[in-house]
Amino acid sequence: MSQNVIRIATRKSPLALWQAEFVKAELEKFHPDLTVELLPMSTKGDIILDTPLAKVGGKGLFVKELEVAMLENRADIAVHSMKDVPVDFPEGLGLEIICEREDPRDAFVSNNYKSISELPKGAVVGTSSLRRQCQIRAARPDLQIRDLRGNVGTRLGKLDAGTYDAIILAAAGLKRLKLEERITSFISAEESLPANGQGAVGIECRTDDERVKALLAPLEHAETRFRVIAERAMNTHLEGGCQVPIGAYAEIVDDTLTLRGLVGNPDGTQIIASTKVGPKTDAKALGISLAEELLSKGAKTILDAVYIK
């Protein structure tokens, strides 16, 4: 492989391609002589669209094929939404870079209603996320939650066709696809705690590829890494994948990190939540400590029931 070429493995969805193009542009900005090529491919999570994500099973539904491409030296790096990245990596691969975070909030999208609180009794809300389901149901047990799969455009099309009264999407994805005008209202972290890593883009590569790691270095964003490390540490200690009713969100003010986390029963009948505060340099320890507290309050019972289903 030429020293002046980097090949990016990416999913084919519009949002994944945006993320890959973003990394491509950043690399070309820092390294004007570099040639960056995209290698688009489909993953299991893209192909199986008729089954709720939580039932497709397995961790890494959206990343495995990209990792195989790197291990087979067909690609040098893979670009991921951090919320889709498993906690464990195949031998020889690792998460090298976490880029600056976009808006981590969820977005409420509807053609007829302004917010979740305005939805009439029995309204149909579309989301494929157990995390979103448990928090919506806890606040509004009268609503009907129905599964929603496909890329952002497909999901918006289903809303516009009248299949749903409202849908919940990640704000970052809508902003990146220049669809911010479709956001009816933002859902605060207090109303719906985001997924760990939501809104952040991560770059995976071969752990022994020093050339590529040096080229990627300028794309690292230190504050985002501390936040995501805390969130992922909590998720990892809970043994959560990306399709579990777990929310985690870290904020940093003056080097102090505040991490909020929750585990919820998908039917909304029980939400276990807590908060940890400490130095940002203790991000991983704070995440583990918060997970331990949630487990001590009964989170394991909820998660075991989800995995059995």
Swiss-Prot record:
Entries under Pfam families matching the protein: Porphobil_deam, Porphobil_deamC
This protein's pathway: Porphyrin-containing compound metabolism; protoporphyrin-IX biosynthesis; coproporphyrinogen-III from 5-aminolevulinate: step 2/4
First-level EC class: transferase
GO biological process entries: protoporphyrinogen IX biosynthetic process
Entry's family note: Belongs to the HMBS family.
Source superkingdom: Bacteria
Keyword DNA repair: no
Swiss-Prot/TrEMBL cofactor(s): dipyrromethane
Its job: Tetrapolymerization of the monopyrrole PBG into the hydroxymethylbilane pre-uroporphyrinogen in several discrete steps.
Reaction catalysis annotation: 4 porphobilinogen + H2O = hydroxymethylbilane + 4 NH4(+)
InterPro entries xref list: HemC, Porphobilin_deaminase_cofac_BS, Porphobilin_deaminase_N, Porphobilinogen_deaminase_C, Porphobilinogen_deaminase_C_sf
The protein, known as: Porphobilinogen deaminase
GO molecular function: hydroxymethylbilane synthase activity
Modified residues (S-(dipyrrolylmethanemethyl)cysteine): 242
Cofactor, how bound (note): Binds 1 dipyrromethane group covalently.
Organism, scientific name: Shewanella woodyi (strain ATCC 51908 / MS32)
Other comments on record: The porphobilinogen subunits are added to the dipyrromethane group.
Record note on quaternary structure: Monomer.
Key words, A-Z: Porphyrin biosynthesis, Transferase
Enzyme Commission number: 2.5.1.61
Entry GO CC: cytoplasm
